[in-house]
């Protein structure tokens, strides 16, 4: 009987979607309890249950199509009573399809959270947390304002200069030396103003831009600013410096806070390390004169994930995604900067 077939289809759909909801709840629990990135991967295999991560929505779609068909019949014979009844039935069918359709939002949310947890644990990132370099806990606004005041590169916005996203971590080089690090996103906003016909300045639009960088604490080098941009730095990096290498001078602009200190520091070996560090990247590398803090600021998105979640319809595909994705620009910067600081 057709009615029995419909009942069976509804039952099968309910069972399939119930399994998906159970898997979603289990994924949330895994994400909250895992201590390491490997814990997440181990919890996903073996799964020992149906691995589906896609809602069954064929029946609601068919119901919506049938409802639309019944509604369109009204244009054939508007006065017919049966056509009018089919119009009401069509609206009811579309409404029922709407309330029974399962959106993918719960799946997308848990996958996004698993991505965040995997990134945090894989790279030891403590998001929105103060670096351990600051022994006394400070309000986020205070310690970020303190860091921005130390370097003359965080005043590029005429309206705002913010760190909407940051994370504290620790880098270890191949000799076992550890560096306290804060990775951040720098967002600044400029306004574009023109004069109207009365000669008054009016704001036309706002321009939003982003840069990304790191602070490295307790570094030995100090009082030097290096940039790949054609610009100058202001106080305290007031003294320009030209090396004996013409190609380096064409590629890098170097400034310092003390000429004698620069003469001691900028030996050929140090200049070569600078050249190697900037071989594949653009940006500013600044060593504060007094605070033993390094700041690198560039255009590469350090929080960029190599592959986003696409067409993940089961637990196996999810595990493969979480196992292989990475932060390529952050890995590259960590490798080159720890090598530079050795």
Which stretches of residues belong to each language-model region?
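Transmembrane alpha-helical segments and their cytosolic interface motifs
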Residues: 50-71
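GHKL/Histidine-kinase-like ATPase module
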Residues: 191-200
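Charged, low-complexity intrinsically disordered regions
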Residues: 117-124, 129-184, 201-342
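Hydrophobic alpha-helical transmembrane segments
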Residues: 58-62, 74-92
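Polar-ligand-bearing catalytic/cofactor-coordination segments
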Residues: 187-189
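Juxtamembrane membrane-interface segments of multi-pass membrane proteins
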Residues: 16, 32-42, 108-127
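Transmembrane alpha-helices and immediately adjacent membrane-cytoplasm interface residues
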Residues: 87-112
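Cytosolic juxtamembrane N-terminal segments of multi-pass membrane proteins
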Residues: 2-55
């Amino acid at each position: 009987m057709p009615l029995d077939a419909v009942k069976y289809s509804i039952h099968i759909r309910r069972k399939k979607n119930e399994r998906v909801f159970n898997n979603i709840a289990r994924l949330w629990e895994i994400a909250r309890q895992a201590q390491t990135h490997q814990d997440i991967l181990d919890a996903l295999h073996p799964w020992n249950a149906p691995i589906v991560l896609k809602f069954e929505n064929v029946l609601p779609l068919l119901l919506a199509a049938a409802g639309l068909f019944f509604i369109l019949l009204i244009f054939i014979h508007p006065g017919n009573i049966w056509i009018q009844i089919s119009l009401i039935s069509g609206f009811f069918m579309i409404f029922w399809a709407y309330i029974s359709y399962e959106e993918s939002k719960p799946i997308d949310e848990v996958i996004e959270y698993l991505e965040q947890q995997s990134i945090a644990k894989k790279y030891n990132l403590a998001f929105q947390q103060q670096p351990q370099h600051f022994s006394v806990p400070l309000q986020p606004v205070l310690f970020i304002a303190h860091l921005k005041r130390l370097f003359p590169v965080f005043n590029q916005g005429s309206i705002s200069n913010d760190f909407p996203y940051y994370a504290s971590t620790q880098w270890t080089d191949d000799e076992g030396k550890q560096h306290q690090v804060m990775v951040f996103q720098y967002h600044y906003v400029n306004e574009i103003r023109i004069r109207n016909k009365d000669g008054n300045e009016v704001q036309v639009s706002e321009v939003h831009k982003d840069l990304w960088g790191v602070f490295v604490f307790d570094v030995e080098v100090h009082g030097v600013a290096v940039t790949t941009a054609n610009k100058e730095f202001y106080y305290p990096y007031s003294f320009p410096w030209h090396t004996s290498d013409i190609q380096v001078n064409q590629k890098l602009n170097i400034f310092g806070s003390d000429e004698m200190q620069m003469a001691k520091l900028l030996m050929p070996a140090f200049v070569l390390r600078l050249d190697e560090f900037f071989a594949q990247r653009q940006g500013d590398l600044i060593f504060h004169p007094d605070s033993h803090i390094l700041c690198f600021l560039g255009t590469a998105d350090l929080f960029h994930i190599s592959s986003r979640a696409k067409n993940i319809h089961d637990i196996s595909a999810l595990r493969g995604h979480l196992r292989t994705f990475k932060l390529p620009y952050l890995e590259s910067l960590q490798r080159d900067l720890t090598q530079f600081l050795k």
